[in-house]
Regions:
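Glycine-rich phosphate/dinucleotide-binding loop and adjoining beta-alpha-beta core of small-molecule
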Residues: 183
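Hydrophobic alpha-helical transmembrane segments
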Residues: 1-174, 178, 186-317
Length: 317
């Protein structure tokens, strides 16, 4: 029933997203990471070796704990009733996907940009990006929103979809645990330089194949949505390594090529300037409507991934 649970979860996310009133596993994961970090920092030596060990313990405990706990719940529910087991898996599969939430948040940015309210647009984009937004121009806000749609299409949709097709909701939520660790601990500053290193490497490994699949699917999605598949393919091949992370530029490069715009480049994080290479060619100025176009491609590649995954699962399993 895993295929049915994945399909149902995809539909649930598409229709409802993540309602604010509904408890989300990622919130619990975040609290667990913070609690573990606090305890480990208090007990381990404040040395590079001690911090590496602490990060390694978090990187082991959280994914393993997530898989065991969710697996036991799914197993227990299925023993009570196969339909209850399916419902639990379907619900968690929906929570592991983030397409609807990503589209909603990025389109909030689009709405404020179209209204011409730059301060409101900066505030809206600050909810979905990690960079400093208080001094961004309208073009900078638009770029940030498009980039986050492209990047999160991989780790917010394609990667969890791939893992749930392989191992159901428990494996998808285990991936979300790894991704949440990376979001909270992977900072190149004094506090997390060593503590966040092992969680970051684990996230790189977990995203290696999904991100490349997402980049290829984005090229196909560009053709389906009336954007430039040729440009997506060309820039993906050229610029997919233009990022400190081995995975982040996979979908960003395909998106930039599909739209004919330039993404990435230098940015400020916590008041510090970070020089970063650009992605894509500025064949035209970026515009707010590119946020909508990016979301259309994100949904198209998500549907392609779902159909392809279900077809392969049906043949193999």
């Amino acid at each position: 029933m895993t295929g049915l649970a994945v399909l149902g979860g995809f539909v649930l996310d598409t229709l409802f997203g993540d309602p604010a009133w509904l408890p989300h596993p990622v919130v619990l994961m975040g609290k667990a990471i913070s609690a573990l970090e606090k305890r480990l920092r208090a007990r381990l030596p404040k040395t590079p070796q001690g911090e590496l060990l602490g990060g390694g313990i978090v990187a082991f405990c959280l994914p393993v704990g997530t898989f065991v706990c969710t697996g036991l719940v799914c197993l227990g529910a299925a023993r009570l009733s196969p339909w209850l087991g399916l419902a639990v898996q379907m619900f968690w599969c929906g929570q592991a996907l983030a397409a609807k939430g990503l589209a909603q948040e990025s389109m909030n940015v689009h709405k404020e940009l179209v209204k011409g309210d730059l301060p409101a647009a900066r505030k809206a984009v600050s909810r979905i990006v990690g960079r400093d937004t208080q001094d961004l121009t309208a073009e900078g806000v638009t770029k940030a929103a498009v980039e986050t749609v492209a990047e999160n299409a991989s780790d917010g949709v394609i990667a969890p979809l791939l893992y749930m097709l392989i191992g159901g909701a428990p494996l998808a939520l285990t991936y979300k645990a790894i991704n949440t660790m990376d979001s909270m601990l992977d900072y190149k500053n004094e506090k997390y330089l060593y503590f966040g290193r092992i969680p970051a490497k684990l996230d790189d490994a977990a995203n290696y194949l999904p991100s490349r699949l997402a980049g290829l699917l984005w090229c196909a999605a560009a053709a389906l949505t009336g954007n430039s598949a040729k440009g997506a393919w060309r820039i993906w091949r050229r610029d997919r390594r233009n990022h400190a992370s081995p995975n982040s530029a996979q979908t960003e490069s395909a998106c930039a090529g599909a739209l004919g715009v330039q993404l990435a480049g230098p940015a400020y994080y916590f008041g510090e300037y970070y020089p970063k290479p650009t992605i894509g060619d500025a064949l035209r100025p970026i515009e707010p409507e590119d946020i909508r176009r990016a979301n259309k491609m994100m949904y198209a590649e998500s549907l392609l991934a779902l159909l392809l995954g279900l077809a392969i699962r049906g043949v193999i399993l």
